[in-house]
UniProtKB/Swiss-Prot annotation:
PSII is composed of 1 copy each of membrane proteins PsbA, PsbB, PsbC, PsbD, PsbE, PsbF, PsbH, PsbI, PsbJ, PsbK, PsbL, PsbM, PsbT, PsbX, PsbY, PsbZ, Psb30/Ycf12, peripheral proteins PsbO, CyanoQ (PsbQ), PsbU, PsbV and a large number of cofactors. It forms dimeric complexes. One of the extrinsic, lumenal subunits of photosystem II (PSII). PSII is a light-driven water plastoquinone oxidoreductase, using light energy to abstract electrons from H(2)O, generating a proton gradient subsequently used for ATP formation. The extrinsic proteins stabilize the structure of photosystem II oxygen-evolving complex (OEC), the ion environment of oxygen evolution and protect the OEC against heat-induced inactivation. It comes from Leptolyngbya laminosa (Phormidium laminosum). Coiled coil: none annotated. This is Photosystem II extrinsic protein U. SUPFAM superfamilies: PsbU/PolX domain-like (SSF81585). GO terms for cellular component: extrinsic component of membrane; photosystem II oxygen evolving complex; plasma membrane-derived thylakoid membrane. It is a peripheral membrane protein.
Length: 143
């Protein structure tokens, strides 16, 4: 009985594999006649622009944008990192550079540091690419 079951299983396996592998699959090629291939004319070429390229062409690349820059950019100015930088990020957006002096909880020393660095600051509208998520606080660059 075991031998009969074994023979039937082998026979069934051979018939199944012959059925799957034995019949060739026909390929259907696409017709590339001139009537079916109609290229559409290009009416106008659109140039794609990255919003960050436009932003870097402004003062953003040279100065600290108070509404868009991350906390690590403040490290280059003494007295700004980390306390003042964190306060600026938490209280942004600002309408003008002078608005940073209106932040609550500033000491006189911190106000002097901010006033001395006004020439290093610029204010522009916040861009979603720069302010979404936690990238302003931790942009993932560790040196």
């Amino acid at each position: 009985m075991k031998r009969l079951v074994g023979v039937l299983m082998i026979l069934g396996l051979m018939l199944t594999s012959w059925g799957l592998l034995g019949s060739p699959q026909t390929a259907i090629a696409a017709s590339l006649s001139p009537l079916s291939f109609n290229p559409s004319p290009v009416l106008a070429e659109q140039q794609f622009r990255n919003a960050m390229d436009d932003k870097l062409a402004t003062d953003f690349g040279k100065k600290i944008d108070l509404n868009n820059t991350n906390v690590r950019a403040f490290m280059q100015y003494p007295g700004m990192y980390p306390t003042l930088a964190r306060m600026i990020l938490k209280n942004a957006p600002f309408e003008s550079v002078e608005d940073v002096l209106k932040m609550p909880g500033l000491t006189d020393t911190q106000k002097e540091i901010l006033k001395n660095n006004f020439s290093n600051f610029v204010v522009s509208p916040p861009l979603d690419a720069l302010v979404e998520g936690g990238d302003r606080f931790n942009n993932g660059i560790y040196r």
